[in-house]
Amino acid sequence: MHVDTLWSNVHLITLDGEGLGVIRDGVLACADGRIVHVGPAGSDANLRPTTRIDGEGRWMSPGLIDCHTHLVYAGNRANEFEQRLQGISYAEIARAGGGIVSTVRATRAATPEQLASESRPRLLAMRAEGVTTLEIKSGYGLTLPDERKQLQVARALGEGCRVNVVTTFLGAHAIPPGREAQEYTDEVCNVMIPAIAAEGLAEAVDVFCENIAFSPAQARQVFEAARAHGLAIKIHAEQLSNQHGAELAASFGALSADHIEHLDDAGIAAMAAAGTVAVLLPGAFYFTRDTTLPPIAALRAAGVPLALATDSNPGTSPLTSPLLAMNMGATLFRLTVDECIAGFTREAARALGRGDRIGRLAIGMDCDLAIWDIDAPADLVYRIGFNPLHARVVRGQPDLPASWSNT
């Protein structure tokens, strides 16, 4: 069988099945951007590759997937970081006109070119750590033209940087200054969601359901509008208090419920029944100096899938390192190495509704890969402040190091 590229002499972290699915001394082949063979050394005898690459004993995993980011924005909120160091809470900052709305002002004022220029370095930092797929939310415009601008810039950045960008509409992120909450919710549902769906600018709709943002009733209204327009559902839930948002989202078959530090047993049961992924965001937990841990043990016991993400945003998680987020997941949330790696691959893909396309090394999946100079998979989680990425591959096309050649 002819194949485009065959990698040999690599240790595979397949994530196919339980655990990491490691195949030592493996081979992987792709054709037309998809994986067509995965197996141990010697299983490739009938393959005729155009390009053969010796992995030289490195490790290969699916390309990393960051399933929760707010990467496209303008401005800087270092001043709020200083305020929090002085003991002022995130909620107090938000109520005083800071927080999300301060980024809204800067993002509205930025041209698309300025927005792309400020956001590109953040995307490149993630790409440099093996990210091949990245979710980017809107939510810093809070008007239809400005939300549209964010989503368009996100899509363009992905195309220009060879990263698969999945866009999520988060118009229900904050109440704009001078607006009444219900009036604005009606606009999100009756004006913004129909337009965003018609223009094909987003795959999902998200809501920040919290006592400083949108009520459960308003979140329900947004979910109903999303469902009516064929968009998937996600939620920022139970970050600061238990609003029962995760349970609500699960009743709509949500892809994921994110943050969930204050999640209760009813929410866990609802997520388990619906197959809703728990997206854990240790960067925000760390940066806001939170002390309430997500109910990890109960989520495990219920069989809720656990994904990890950076939550990259200017206010509560200015983090662009998936590798550091993995370490935080282990040290702060007591996740295992397997859970951390799966959380940025297989389970992150599920949180984006793409579990049948990315996140595993298996026949038929997109050939999105990360190749690492490590001794064992645990090195991806254990070490801090280093980047062992050797190469990325997106749909079968490598970012070729100089040492690779066609042989």
Swiss-Prot record:
Binding site for Fe(3+): 68, 70, 236, 311
Name assigned to this protein: Imidazolonepropionase
GO MF annotations, alphabetized: imidazolonepropionase activity; iron ion binding; zinc ion binding
Catalyzed reaction equations: 4-imidazolone-5-propanoate + H2O = N-formimidoyl-L-glutamate
Cofactor(s) this protein requires: Zn(2+); Fe(3+)
Residues reported in the UniProt entry to bind 4-imidazolone-5-propanoate: 77, 140, 173, 239, 316
CDD domains referenced in this protein's UniProt entry, alphabetically: Imidazolone-5PH
This protein's record includes keyword NAD: no
Example GO biological process: L-histidine catabolic process to glutamate and formamide
Location(s) in or outside the cell: Cytoplasm
GO CC annotation: cytoplasm
Residues given in the record as N-formimidoyl-L-glutamate binding sites: 140, 313, 315
Role played: Catalyzes the hydrolytic cleavage of the carbon-nitrogen bond in imidazolone-5-propanoate to yield N-formimidoyl-L-glutamate. It is the third step in the universal histidine degradation pathway.
Enzyme Commission numbers on file: 3.5.2.7
Co-factor binding details: Binds 1 zinc or iron ion per subunit.
UniProt xrefs under Gene3D superfamilies: Metal-dependent hydrolases (3.20.20.140), Urease, subunit C, domain 1 (2.30.40.10)
Residues annotated as binding Zn(2+): 68, 70, 236, 311
Keywords: Cytoplasm, Histidine metabolism, Hydrolase, Iron, Metal-binding, Zinc
Family: Belongs to the metallo-dependent hydrolases superfamily. HutI family.
Involved pathway(s): Amino-acid degradation; L-histidine degradation into L-glutamate; N-formimidoyl-L-glutamate from L-histidine: step 3/3
Top-rank EC class of the record's enzyme: hydrolase
